[in-house]
Design a protein with these regions (language model features):
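Basic/aromatic recognition patch in beta-strand/loop cores that engages polyanionic ligands
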Residues: 42-87
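Compact soluble domain cores
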Residues: 24-42
Length: 117
């Protein structure tokens, strides 16, 4: 399955903060985007379309377990193609997990946007 990777405004805002702390994050995210293109459903499935991806931040030097978490939403278009929306990113050392409330808000926003298309 192949997919397109689409960055949401929430993700842009969150990644901007982390880029100031971790200079390698830009290249780490480029590798993630390439991986998502080939395997849109990577990570731990949180709900029908939502996945949590563990991302190692090279400049942080702690591997995947101490890196960042990326929340993605996979919109399946055909059997062979899907769009992957990057909803948010957070530093594992700042937040253990994303709250259910915030996750529901992010999912609702993307589903509202998709229904408008």
């Amino acid at each position: 399955m192949k997919g397109n990777v689409i960055v949401t405004p929430d993700f842009k805002r969150d990644v901007k903060k982390l880029l100031k702390k971790y200079p390698s994050l830009k290249s780490d995210l480029a590798r993630l985007a390439a991986d998502l293109f080939l395997n849109p459903k990577m990570g731990t499935q949180l709900s029908a379309h939502v996945y949590k991806i563990r991302l190692a931040i090279k400049s942080k030097g702690k591997g995947k377990s101490g890196g960042a978490r990326v929340i993605s939403y996979v919109d399946i278009l055909t059997i062979e193609e899907s769009d992957v929306y990057l909803l948010t990113i957070y530093d594992k050392s700042e937040f253990e997990n994303i709250s259910d409330k915030k996750l529901k808000e992010l999912i609702q926003r993307i589903e509202d946007d998709l229904s408008d298309i």
